[in-house]
Amino acid sequence: MGQKVHPHGLRVGVIKGWDAKWYANKKDFADNLVEDNQIRKFVKKELFSAGISKIEIERAAKRVKLNIYTAKPGVVIGKGGSGIESLKKKLTNYISGKNILINIVEVKSVEAEAQLMAENIAAQLEKRISFRRAMKQTMQRAMRHGIKGVKTSCSGRLGGAEIARTEHYHEGTIPLQTLRADIDYGFAEANTTYGKIGVKVWVYKGEVLPTKKVEKEEANA
């Protein structure tokens, strides 16, 4: 089942954390969940040019904190913090009666972030660049940044073909069923003249958890 399940969801509680860090009772849970979804969609659309790889949402009683992971923090912050203030004002349409805090986290290795890689391939497909060339170039750039493996997939009417199909390419290793393997996953859609093309990217960055046996041996030594 490691082939089918979302790599992040499979590893939550093992080596990955939640992107929504809050607790709510039954009465408020659904409202908060819908609000989170609206916030993510809006921020992604508003700051698409900034290369947003992930948005974490933390909630307290009357406070909502957004941790925005971006490749271009300057674009989000703006001159003298004007970008953040503008974003806060627009977010009041989705978050009412709560104090909004925004924390910007810079993504260091853009070429090794699965979500940004998927969006990059999708953008190239929209510019009518060959899907094979877009996938292979993106993978080669990622491998040069010291990752262990990368796999890409494009689904749809590739090259304007009559029948939709899926093509995969991979370099290195992608141990999807190994829970201690740090696998990043990204998905994007390209709107072409022939219809939508789905782009998926898996990036293997190495193992996270050491074996418990080794830890015990070191403790006893």
From Swiss-Prot:
It comes from Clostridium botulinum (strain Eklund 17B / Type B). HAMAP family: Ribosomal_uS3_B. This is Small ribosomal subunit protein uS3. Keywords: Ribonucleoprotein, Ribosomal protein, RNA-binding, rRNA-binding. One of its GO terms (cellular component) is cytosolic small ribosomal subunit. CDD domains: KH-II_30S_S3. The gene is rpsC. Pfam families: KH_2 (PF07650), Ribosomal_S3_C (PF00189). Binds the lower part of the 30S subunit head. Binds mRNA in the 70S ribosome, positioning it for translation. Belongs to the universal ribosomal protein uS3 family. Transmembrane segments: none annotated.
